[in-house]
Amino acid sequence: MAENQANAAADEAAEPIVGHVTRIQGSVIDVEFPVGHMPDIYNALTVEIKQMGQQEEGEVKDSVITLEVEQHLGDSTARCVALKSTDGLVRGAIVHDTGGPIEVPVGDVTKGHVFDVSGHILNKKPGEKIVIKERWPIHRNPPAFDQLESKTQMFETGIKVIDLLTPYVQGGKIGLFGGAGVGKTVLIQEMIQRVAQNHGGVSVFAGVGERTREGNDLIGEMDEAGVLEKTALVFGQMDEQPGTRLRVPLTALTMAEYFRDVQNQDVLLFIDNIFRFTQAGSEVSTLLGRMPSAVGYQPNLADEMGSLQERITSTRGHSITSLQAIYVPADDYTDPAPATTFAHLDATTELSRDIASRGIYPAVDPLASTSRILDPRYVGQAHYDCANRVKAILQRNKELQDIIALIGIDELGEEDKTTVNRARKIEQFLGQNFYVAEKFTGVPGSYVPAEETIEAFTRICDGVYDNVPEQAFSGIGGIEDLEKKWHKMQKEYGD
């Protein structure tokens, strides 16, 4: 008898749990399950809907929608969020519990491919055979405390303004803050190219709630540059459901974790845009009927952000370095979305509309950008001293701008005149030509090692280039480019 009960229990466990749709409100679906068979929170559910095909064929196509369980209501009802459009879904539709969270492909199969939030390949070529050997759930715990890597090391980018004033941490989290149109996405595209060319690591890109055109352009540019084969891309763009946009970063992060933990590789994770992740969370929270918090954001904003950011870290010997574009609504840095992100970052690169309007790119604000490793213990005394001298000159120039506007630069003392002239040269020299902008500007991109950057700015601060005009410092790479441009200008215009 005991054996029969065991067999019955095994048969019952083997049978998939089936529920029925009881309520549909936009992308929020209520599903009723048999008593005692409620799926866990974050479990993936699937439901088939019938869609009519082309009229002349009259065929019926089946479409599968994935739902994610977000809440348990009374009466054995689960409230779920749909990850696809619910067009065609009706009450009474049969829903199957998959028995676990959304699982996505991991490993080498992800390189060179574009995925959606559920791990479906979007750029499969005709006749291409893809064998997926392993899948991981997107909801995972962060590494245990004793597995974390305590070593702090600078990640060299070859971009002068970043390496000098806001050095990035290998295995750290970096935020690119800025309003609309100041160059966040371009800087991320440039970093992807530089990592592939100079570091040879694996990159994972998450496109969260951004323009579909930008995603298409990015894929094309990466393919042309030959870096697509070392990159996995996951997209949930502007036209996707809020549930999709909320989970896309987790899908990309899961792929990155496999490269770090199983293949023992250093990984770069790019997220564009983390604000859209917060925005999607706000939409889902409202749809689920939660009381909004400050400025209409979800009450669990800090918890949602923390659950994502705490998984982006270094374990012993291997790292995930994350570069996150963060849109700042109306250039307001006190907005809860960017303000919540600040607490998790190791370095912040703030992009300025004023600097962009002067044609200096990347339009990084050197005084507002920060890094926790701009410290002699991590970058060395020479780097630290040079960065502080550059900031002091730029700060003094900023203070003098009101006086210059009133009485003119000629009325300043000699020391202040020298400071202003050096500051203008520094501002121009902090700009740099990018590889990804080469086809627009016609100027080749440049990689400047950190040592050369420190040497060049130390010379400017020491007055070595006081006789070189400001125009010679714009749109160039290192010292060699500066001297070439200066000699060319001398030949064209005379000594």
From Swiss-Prot:
UniProtKB keywords: ATP synthesis, ATP-binding, Cell membrane, CF(1), Hydrogen ion transport, Ion transport, Membrane, Nucleotide-binding, Translocase, Transport
GO molecular function: ATP binding; ATP hydrolysis activity; proton-transporting ATP synthase activity, rotational mechanism
Record-annotated disulphide pairs: none
Membrane topology of the entry: Peripheral membrane protein
Positions contributing to ATP binding: G178, G179, A180, G181, V182, G183, K184, T185
Catalysed reaction, written as an equation: ATP + H2O + 4 H(+)(in) = ADP + phosphate + 5 H(+)(out)
EC number of the protein: 7.1.2.2
Domain of life where this protein originates: Bacteria
Localization, UniProt: Cell membrane
Pfam families: ATP-synt_ab, ATP-synt_ab_N, ATP-synt_VA_C
Broad class of where this protein is predominantly found: membrane
A GO-annotated cellular component: proton-transporting ATP synthase complex
InterPro entries noted in UniProt: AAA+_ATPase, ATP-synt_VA_C, ATP_synth_F1_bsu, ATPase_a/bsu_AS, ATPase_alpha/beta_chains, ATPase_F1/V1/A1_a/bsu_N, ATPase_F1/V1/A1_a/bsu_N_sf, ATPase_F1/V1/A1_a/bsu_nucl-bd
Transmembrane segments: none
Oligomeric and partner information: F-type ATPases have 2 components, CF(1) - the catalytic core - and CF(0) - the membrane proton channel. CF(1) has five subunits: alpha(3), beta(3), gamma(1), delta(1), epsilon(1). CF(0) has three main subunits: a(1), b(2) and c(9-12). The alpha and beta chains form an alternating ring which encloses part of the gamma chain. CF(1) is attached to CF(0) by a central stalk formed by the gamma and epsilon chains, while a peripheral stalk is formed by the delta and b chains.
UniProt similarity note: Belongs to the ATPase alpha/beta chains family.
Job of this protein: Produces ATP from ADP in the presence of a proton gradient across the membrane. The catalytic sites are hosted primarily by the beta subunits.
Name this polypeptide is given: ATP synthase subunit beta
Organism of provenance: Bifidobacterium animalis subsp. lactis (strain AD011)
